[in-house]
């Protein structure tokens, strides 16, 4: 019997299944384990990155990072280090194939079902390739598990009904680890300073124009909004650079669009060089946001 029986990839924040292996095991115990895995997937955000839920015949292992988690049903004979090495390899394969925007925009279950081909390939590798060929990878995972043991549950702990777990009110455990970004660069700091300066200029001009327009006419409302909307967009660009946010690329494009349209609308109140300066800063900030990635270690568990 295989050590790794089933695997799936889910979105952490809501447990949406993104892909899964098309395995056909019809034993009652296995189907019950599948049901509990689905329940556990809905609560992954409550647990740290790695965890295991053990039952009488099968065990569930999960490993999550960013907004993607990989889960597996294994036989009890499967070593924990092998299971987590498998999950980490699967995670890297998935994130290399689909970016965070695709994952964040997924709206239906199994939107990436074609990834099953990769799951089967990785699963076959870990089930049938000699463990001596993976000694370095397994040894590294074993060391990590010693220093940071996974959360250990029972399969009964995963059964939740109406907010009650095993007769007790469901308590939220510590949240998933916060996302750590790459260090801020000198060019990134410059983009922040310029963005704050542009935001301040937009706010000052917008407030000044609003005070004047209240006494004169309502035709200036468009100009006021053309100052204030880019002000908000500049501040949000600073936030996107400093902190991780899902669907970051889409948000960056929207903020850049707001700033560009606002400045083009203000061509009568700003000269060409002022407009080019504001748009140039917006492009610089957008570039810095998209090039600053999450800090994460590379996996040694190759296929």
UniProtKB/Swiss-Prot annotation:
Topological category with respect to the lipid bilayer: Multi-pass membrane protein
InterPro entries: Longin-like_dom_sf, Longin_dom, Sec22a/c
Localization in the cell: Endoplasmic reticulum membrane
CDD domains assigned to the protein according to its UniProt record, in alphabetical order: Longin (cd14824)
GO cellular component, one term: endoplasmic reticulum membrane
UniProt topological domain (Cytoplasmic) ranges: 1-183, 245-248, 292-303
Residues passing through the membrane, by range: 184-204, 224-244, 249-269, 271-291
SMART domains reported for this sequence: Longin
GO biological process: endoplasmic reticulum to Golgi vesicle-mediated transport; protein transport
Top-rank taxon: Eukaryota
Keyword Transport: yes
Alphabetically ordered keywords of this record: Endoplasmic reticulum, ER-Golgi transport, Membrane, Protein transport, Transmembrane, Transmembrane helix, Transport
UniProt topological domain (Lumenal) ranges: 205-223, 270
Broad class of the protein's primary localization: endoplasmic reticulum
Domain annotation Longin: ranges: 8-119
Family: Belongs to the synaptobrevin family.
Function: May be involved in vesicle transport between the ER and the Golgi complex.
Protein name, per record: Vesicle-trafficking protein SEC22c
């Amino acid at each position: 019997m295989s050590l790794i029986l089933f695997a799936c990839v889910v979105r952490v924040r809501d447990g949406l299944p993104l892909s899964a292996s098309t395995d056909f095991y019809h034993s009652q115990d296995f189907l019950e384990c599948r049901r509990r895995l689905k329940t556990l997937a809905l609560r992954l955000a409550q647990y740290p990155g790695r965890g295991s839920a053990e039952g009488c015949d099968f065990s569930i292992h999960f490993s999550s990072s960013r907004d993607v988690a990989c889960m597996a049903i294994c036989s009890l004979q499967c070593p924990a280090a092998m299971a987590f090495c498998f999950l980490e390899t699967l995670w890297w394969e998935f994130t290399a194939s689909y970016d965070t925007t695709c994952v964040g925009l997924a709206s239906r279950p199994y939107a990436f079902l074609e990834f099953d081909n990769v799951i089967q390939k990785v699963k076959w590798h870990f089930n049938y390739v000699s463990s001596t060929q993976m000694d370095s990878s397994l040894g590294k995972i074993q060391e990590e598990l010693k220093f940071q043991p996974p959360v250990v549950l029972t399969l009964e702990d995963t059964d939740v009904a109406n907010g009650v777990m095993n007769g007790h009110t469901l308590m939220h455990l510590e949240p998933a680890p916060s996302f750590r970004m790459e260090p801020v660069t000198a060019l990134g700091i410059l983009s922040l300073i310029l963005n704050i300066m542009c935001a301040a200029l937009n706010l000052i001009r917008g407030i000044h124009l609003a005070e004047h327009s209240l006494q004169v006419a309502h035709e200036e409302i468009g100009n006021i909004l053309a100052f204030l909307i880019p002000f908000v967009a500049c501040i949000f660009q600073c936030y996107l650079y400093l902190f991780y946010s899902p669907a970051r690329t889409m948000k960056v494009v929207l903020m850049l669009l707001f700033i560009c349209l606002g400045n083009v609308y203000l061509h009568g109140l700003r000269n060409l060089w002022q407009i080019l300066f504001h748009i140039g800063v917006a492009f610089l900030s957008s570039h810095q946001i998209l090039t600053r990635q999450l800090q994460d270690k590379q996996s040694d568990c190759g296929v």
